[in-house]
Amino acid sequence: MRVSLRSITSLLAAATAAVLAAPATETLDRRAALPNPYDDPFYTTPSNIGTFAKGQVIQSRKVPTDIGNANNAASFQLQYRTTNTQNEAVADVATVWIPAKPASPPKIFSYQVYEDATALDCAPSYSYLTGLDQPNKVTAVLDTPIIIGWALQQGYYVVSSDHEGFKAAFIAGYEEGMAILDGIRALKNYQNLPSDSKVALEGYSGGAHATVWATSLADSYAPELNIVGASHGGTPVSAKDTFTFLNGGPFAGFALAGVSGLSLAHPDMESFIEARLNAKGQQTLKQIRGRGFCLPQVVLTYPFLNVFSLVNDTNLLNEAPIAGILKQETVVQAEASYTVSVPKFPRFIWHAIPDEIVPYQPAATYVKEQCAKGANINFSPYPIAEHLTAEIFGLVPSLWFIKQAFDGTTPKVICGTPIPAIAGITTPSADQVLGSDLANQLRSLNGKQSAFGKPFGPITPP
């Protein structure tokens, strides 16, 4: 599909207008309920961070959000201790929702929303707050309320970490994965949940990247967590492959955001790139890291940008330290400089074969490699979808899989067998899985503009 600059601009404008119109089911104030994270001490790592254990809650506060109100859920922000890429103790923030009627025994649902930007005020915890002026609000008002609302209907405790951390290190796998695992620990600590509480994870696109890294690091970083399943779709499994796929194309802003995010997580990469930036590159890197420069701006500002035009060295990907970092920031074994782990719990992975934002082939390679090492993966490639339609196609089947994982009833499959999961055909329908109210909300997304500057749909879920 050919995408023009004019079409991207018009779609982003429509997406912004859709957010400002606000969901019909909620009454939202224009201003966020709390200060911008840049002005909020809650987003500052305390000087004694090293005295806290991983996942220990440092401070907490009750917050109003636009999500979970129909379920009478209580929402809180937790500041907790986690670990960065350099294995240093740092603080992070997670939003948690406490169900009005918790399932017994307790179950924990970890949801990773796509943030896809490198500014602190793009963080999910800020976007979730009641209000309309948050710069990344569009990521929190479309399918996200449906997913979290469904989990609360089941009585699951919900945690959604700011997986990019206070540095907003987009696409930095270690940083994201550890932040998520410690966010789950923080929720368990905050609610005094049993040590063996079942945990499941879900994410799409940038949120899927965070999810796959959490699943990959779980066995070594948080082996005590009782993870029973994970679903993720449109997953960027390789930083290098995703960058190469995006650079120079209509969604080149994500390639630039990835360079910015990885550099924020790897100081040696930051120093290396800074020394090679030309004048345009210096200005552009400062811009993408600027306050309020979030997913819509990333997409709108840089279509067809060649990131190499910002530096005086076009061989960066093959030079140290970047070449070595890219071999670390991948879960594809054929590219990795380390042994990629194989999670033991069942997973549901879906992807559009003609995906125009996240390349399909690396994800398929990851599934093949994992299956060869004994993984349990339900693989659902969609041959006639693209990034946004696949997001909707996989939503109901992925949540159904999560419920099965919690119930211990995931289907036995030959790992990696490509079988498209279709709600109402191969899985229960949207009404059966979500209930009629949430199913109708999902159908209402058909044709609405997404945060990616493209519409959901056009196919309405059954």
Curated annotation (Swiss-Prot):
Disulfide bonds join C122-C294, C371-C415. It is found in: Secreted. It catalyses: a triacylglycerol + H2O = a diacylglycerol + a fatty acid + H(+). Optimum pH is between 7-9. This is Lipase A. Monomer. Changing S205A: Abolishes enzyme activity. Residues 1-21 form the signal peptide. Hydrolyzes triglycerides, with a preference for substrates with short-chain lengths (C4 to C8). Has the highest activity with tributyrin (C4), followed by tricaproin (C6) and tricaprylin (C8). Can also hydrolyze vinylacetate (C2) and triolein (C18), but with lower efficiency. Has no activity with tripalmitin (C16). Gene3D superfamilies: 1.10.260.130, alpha/beta hydrolase. The keyword Lipid metabolism applies. InterPro entries: AB_hydrolase_fold (IPR029058), Lipase_secreted (IPR005152). Belongs to the AB hydrolase superfamily. Lipase family.
